[in-house]
Design a protein with these regions (language model features):
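Glycine-/small-residue-enriched transmembrane alpha-helix faces in small-molecule transporters
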Residues: 1-41, 154-181, 205, 310
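Loop-to-transmembrane-helix transition segments
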Residues: 8-16, 63-92, 159-168, 217-244, ...
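Hydrophobic/small/kink-forming positions within alpha-helical transmembrane segments
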Residues: 18-21, 52, 81-86, 90, ...
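Specific transmembrane alpha-helical segments of multi-pass solute transporters/efflux pumps
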Residues: 19, 23-24, 52, 56-109, ...
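Transmembrane alpha-helical segments that form core, pore/gating elements
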Residues: 25, 51, 116-118, 122, ...
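Helix-helix packing/entry segments at the starts of transmembrane helices
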Residues: 40-42, 102-111, 177-201, 238-277
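C-terminal transmembrane-helix exit sites in multi-pass transporters
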Residues: 50-58, 112-137, 270-290
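Hydrophobic transmembrane alpha-helices of multi-pass small-molecule transport proteins
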Residues: 51, 131-150, 266, 275, ...
Length: 310
């Protein structure tokens, strides 16, 4: 039992990364019918309704019961929602739009493990060991091999795209910092619920300005087959990517810390490559398998705990 509890944070974050690694496929499927902002609002609305239903039906003292936040903690939940998903999704979209190569955008957006130790050390006084740094570097090399090997377009495009990408990564890391600051008395479901509710309050007026009601009327104009695929993709994003994955990630951040949790972001391209191999038959060259191996080795090295010197 104790052994299972010890490995639960790692199993939890790997589950989150596995779900998020397939979310790109679901997003592309949903965007065939829905505009981006409409898709985001629909996704998070369904996620919040699901969490509300679970939270209200769960026994009062269970880990899935929805807890009422105190007034002094509300700013943390709101700040978390501003950082991610609100700012992150907007900056990520602009970075993909400004950079001519999706490959470069994906590589830049995968640098959160590199930035996380510096944010955690400065803002949380989190101890960073040589193993953390070494593991992150090894897994980042693996991530770059996965993303860049076989890519045909390395042009940058608008330099602002680089700034948007790094700003997006910074907001993602700051989100994990906020998660660490939220008092441990709140369970992960309550944390994710209030964070995403804060973001949805910001997304709705933005959606009204950009898409209006026309974004939702596209669902009525789609063919039955296309509608089924779109709703299935949105359901996956709502239940899987926005509820299960966020709760799993939140739990891990609060148990093992910002640096060690963010290191697992490097495994997402590896999972994506495996999804593409299994479902689309996309073959992986040997260099990408080396990249996957580097990511796994780097993650093991990063998780080595070294006590700070007294």
């Amino acid at each position: 039992m104790r052994s299972m509890k010890r490995f639960l944070p790692y199993l939890s974050v790997l589950t989150a990364m596995l779900i998020w690694s397939a979310s790109g496929i679901a997003i592309k499927e949903a965007l065939v019918v829905l505009p981006p902002m409409t898709m985001i609002v629909l996704r998070f609305s369904l996620a919040i309704l699901l969490m509300l239903l679970i939270g209200l039906c769960a026994p009062r003292n269970s880990m899935f019961a929805l807890q009422k936040p105190s007034k002094k903690d509300l700013p943390l939940f709101i700040l978390g929602g501003i950082f991610q998903p609100f700012l992150y999704y907007i900056l990520e979209t602009y970075s993909y739009d400004a950079l001519s190569s999706p490959t470069i955008a994906e590589a830049l957006l995968s640098t959160s493990p590199v930035l996380a130790p510096f944010f955690a050390a400065v803002l949380l006084r989190e101890h960073i060991s040589i193993f953390n740094i070494l593991g992150i570097l090894i897994s980042t090399v693996g991530m770059l091999l996965l993303v860049l090997v076989g890519a045909s377009d390395f042009s940058i495009g608008n330099p602002w795209g680089i700034a948007f990408a790094f700003a997006a990564v910074s907001t993602a890391v700051l989100y994990t910092i906020v998660l660490r600051r939220i008092p441990s008395r709140y369970n992960p479901l309550s944390v994710v619920f209030y964070v995403q509710l804060s973001a949805l309050v910001l997304f709705v007026p933005l959606c009204a300005c950009t898409d209006g009601i026309s974004g939702f009327t596209r669902l009525t104009q789609a063919s039955p087959d296309l509608l089924c695929h779109t709703l299935g993709a949105v359901a996956y994003l709502a239940v899987g990517a926005s509820v299960i994955a966020f709760i799993c990630f939140c739990y891990t951040v609060r148990v093992i810390g910002v640096t060690r949790t963010n290191a697992f972001n490097n495994v997402r391209p590896a999972f994506t490559a495996i999804w593409m191999l299994l479902f689309f038959g996309e073959q992986l060259p040997w260099a990408k398998w080396v990249g996957i191996l580097c990511i796994i080795i780097g993650l093991f090295v990063c998780q080595i705990v070294q006590s700070p010197k007294k």
